[in-house]
């Protein structure tokens, strides 16, 4: 009987722990949050119980504190943060790159420390599309401008066109010149906050061959004229740069 009640209590404790995990009251890992430079971001705390004491920290440094109903913000966060005294959620305004870090919230009313990792991103620029001919194929590359250095590792690539190649999530794709080429292809860059798209017309990647064909076709014409002139001159029919003999036979 005792064993049965112990098992029941253990099951009950396990159920409570699972519920706490589900509702976010126990946090073993940092929740990833994304914000944009000069924007704002909120660390949401799932609590409906009014909190009398709250401490927010960035690593080991204090960010904001609520104690005895008195709110204080610290260092560079002064006049840039708002604390919801009911839930404990913290909002940071006018984000800068230096705000990026791990934040944690502590309160006697919450079982464990809440942790968040903030990524501060810059607006995503439009991609640059270039193309080149390589061994009978057209290579199209989608590139990020060199000056953009904000979390390149978070950027994903996607293509849009009716061909199989566009299903790849890579920085470059290839098209055979003998295939029916799509009129336009698009490349999209995306990260957790932004996406931008650029397009290119594939036919502009192929150099025009019409002028080269006419140029090469005209080459034999002057050669034929020169050859004919030489043959006629050698046979005495055409005399170049010679005046006729006007001496009187008398």
From Swiss-Prot:
It comes from the Eukaryota. Residues 29-215 are extracellular. Disulfide bonds join 142-187. Residues 239-250 are cytoplasmic. Glycans are attached at residues 40, 94, 109, 135, 169, 195. The chain crosses the membrane at residues 216-238. Ligand of the T-lymphocyte CD2 glycoprotein. This interaction is important in mediating thymocyte interactions with thymic epithelial cells, antigen-independent and -dependent interactions of T-lymphocytes with target cells and antigen-presenting cells and the T-lymphocyte rosetting with erythrocytes. In addition, the LFA-3/CD2 interaction may prime response by both the CD2+ and LFA-3+ cells. Interacts with CD2. Interacts with CMTM6. (Microbial infection) Interacts with human cytomegalovirus protein UL148; this interaction retains immature CD58 intracellularly. This is Lymphocyte function-associated antigen 3. It comes from Homo sapiens.
């Amino acid at each position: 009987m005792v064993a049965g009640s112990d098992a029941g209590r253990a099951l009950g404790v396990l159920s409570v722990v699972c519920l706490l995990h589900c509702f976010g009251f126990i946090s073993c890992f940092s929740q990833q949050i994304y914000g944009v430079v000069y924007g704002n971001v909120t660390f949401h705390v799932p609590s409906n119980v009014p909190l009398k004491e709250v401490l927010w920290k960035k690593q080991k440094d204090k960010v904001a504190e609520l104690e005895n109903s008195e709110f204080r913000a610290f260092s560079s966060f002064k006049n840039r943060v708002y604390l919801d005294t009911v839930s404990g959620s913290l909002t940071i305004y006018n984000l800068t790159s230096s705000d990026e870090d791990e934040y944690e919230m502590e309160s006697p009313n919450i079982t464990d420390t809440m942790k968040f990792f903030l990524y501060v991103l810059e607006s995503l620029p439009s991609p640059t599309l270039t193309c080149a001919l390589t061994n009978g194929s057209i290579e199209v590359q989608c590139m990020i401008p060199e000056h953009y250095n904000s979390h390149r590792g978070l950027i994903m690539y996607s293509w849009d066109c009716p061909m199989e190649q566009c299903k790849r999530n890579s920085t470059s794709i290839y098209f055979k010149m003998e295939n029916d080429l799509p009129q336009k292809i698009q490349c999209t860059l995306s990260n957790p906050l932004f996406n931008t798209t650029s397009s290119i017309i594939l036919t502009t990647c192929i150099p025009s061959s019409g002028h080269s064909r006419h140029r090469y076709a005209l080459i034999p014409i002057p050669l034929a004229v020169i050859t004919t002139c030489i043959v006629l001159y050698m046979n005495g029919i055409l005399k170049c740069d010679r005046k006729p003999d006007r001496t009187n036979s008398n």
